Regions:
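Short, polar loop motifs at secondary-structure junctions
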Residues: 365-369
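AAA+/SF3 P-loop NTPase mechanochemical coupling elements
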Residues: 308-314, 345-364
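A short helix-turn-beta junction within AAA+ P-loop NTPase domains corresponding to the substrate/partner-engaging
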Residues: 372-387
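P-loop NTPase catalytic core of nucleic-acid-dependent motor ATPases
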Residues: 63-91, 157-315, 381-383
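Alpha-helical scaffold elements adjacent to nucleotide-binding pockets in ATP/GTP-utilizing enzyme cores
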Residues: 95, 279-283, 332-336, 363, ...
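Walker B catalytic acidic pair
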Residues: 321-324
Length: 388
């Protein structure tokens, strides 16, 4: 089980949450105890009543709704205490079967009847279209002056001069957090200390711990011309840290893509294995809900994939274009960087992001990004890697 799935399991399959919902369902059940057939979902001729109770009351007590996103699209979700997870008919079936079976005496019987005799209770078309709509809800997002980090034990609100922590239940009315964006660790306020820029920029090579910090600084080392020793370049680290911070803060102020390339690029050569993907892909995937895209899908050779954003979901916070090829067509991203973002999914479906709400973007490349002029320059924050 992945860490993200582990959080979903512990959060939504919580025994107290299920027990509370089951008590409400027992107070007005959608099933009856038939004198001949035993426990059944509905009596003869009373299907409409049972359907209404099941879809309108039972499923909503378990937190299942159709959430409206971007004012035009509905997505099936489960809600609990300010956290939402995107679901499908299989998840709903598994959760309902698990929860109902916990009801003493009749739970197993009613699940058996629903599964064998009345399988339409779990039919994809019926269950997803019958979920009740949930309107006027929006996810927590960063603003110009505030950033949020979501941990298993609550929400961290970060301003320039303060850090506050509160539970998911204390979110503002009408706001929620996607479960995919919850970091799989608890927040420890005792680890927070006042930021010291001089200490942050200083070479950490001789200090213990801070492994990722030192990894990033190692990318900013180059050999001196005199004795060929590795020398730390503080200005390059500033550029890398600035780009990294821009990606972590999800407010779109400057519409740019962070690009990490080798410093000494030579035409016709590919200088890989220097750690660029570790920084822009592996590192950020542990801090943001990330989708990695093979950057070779976007090239001037006409290799165009209409479903390049297939795996992007409403909860996605960052898109990594990994290992851009020598003819990476950066122009394809122009409108996606400065405007809205439309993501087409295979087998139907589309997700649209407003220009302020779309995921941040970064790319790593062993080659120069082709293109000249302000349209290219204004959309790029370039960080060079000098470890070769």
């Amino acid at each position: 089980m992945t860490k993200k799935k582990s959080f979903v399991s512990s959060w939504f399959f919580d025994s107290s949450f299920i027990a509370s919902a089951n008590n409400e369902i027992l107070a007005d059940p959608f099933w009856v105890d038939h004198p001949k057939m035993g426990v059944v979902p509905f009596e003869d001729g009373d299907m409409g009543r049972a359907c209404t109770k099941y879809f309108a009351e039972c499923l909503t007590k378990y937190g299942f709704y159709n959430l409206m996103v971007n004012g035009s699209q509905f997505i099936p979700v489960q809600f609990k205490d300010g956290v939402a997870v995107e679901v499908d008919e299989t998840y709903i079936k598994d959760f309902v079967c698990y929860a109902l079976k916990l009801i003493p005496e009749v739970g197993v019987k009613i699940v058996d009847q629903m599964s064998v005799r009345y399988g339409w209770f779990f039919s994809k078309n019926k269950i997803l279209t019958s979920l009740r709509p949930l309107m006027d809800m929006s996810p927590m997002t960063d603003s110009r002056s505030v950033a949020y980090r979501f941990h298993q034990n609550g929400v961290v609100k970060i301003r320039e001069d303060e850090i506050k922590f509160h539970s998911f239940k204390e979110l503002p009315e009408g706001r929620f957090v996607w479960s995919d964006q919850v970091l799989c660790r608890n927040f420890n306020p005792d680890l927070i200390k006042e930021f010291n820029e001089e200490e942050f920029l200083k070479d950490q090579i001789g200090n213990s711990g801070n492994h990722f910090h030192k990894w990033c600084q190692n990318l900013c080392r180059g050999r001196s011309e005199d004795d060929k020793k590795w020398v730390y370049n503080e200005e390059k680290f500033k550029s890398l840290a600035s780009g990294y911070g821009y990606l972590l803060h999800r407010y779109w102020s400057d519409y740019k893509v962070v690009i990490l390339v080798d410093e000494n690029i030579q035409e016709g050569s590919s200088n890989g294995r220097t750690g660029k993907s570790v920084v822009l892909d592996d590192g950020l995937s542990n801090a943001l809900e990330c989708v990695t895209i093979d950057a070779s899908e976007i090239s001037k050779k006409g290799n165009r994939n209409n479903f390049v954003f297939n795996f992007v979901r409403p909860s996605t916070q960052y898109i990594s274009f990994d290992d851009a090829c020598d003819d990476f067509d950066f122009r394809v991203l122009f409108s996606k960087i400065t405007g809205s973002l439309t993501c087409n999914a295979k087998y139907g479906g589309m997700i649209q992001f407003d220009k302020k709400d779309k995921p941040k973007m970064g790319t790593s490349s062993n080659h120069a990004i082709l293109g000249d002029g302000s349209s290219f320059v204004d959309r790029q924050h370039i960080v060079t890697d000098s470890t070769k």
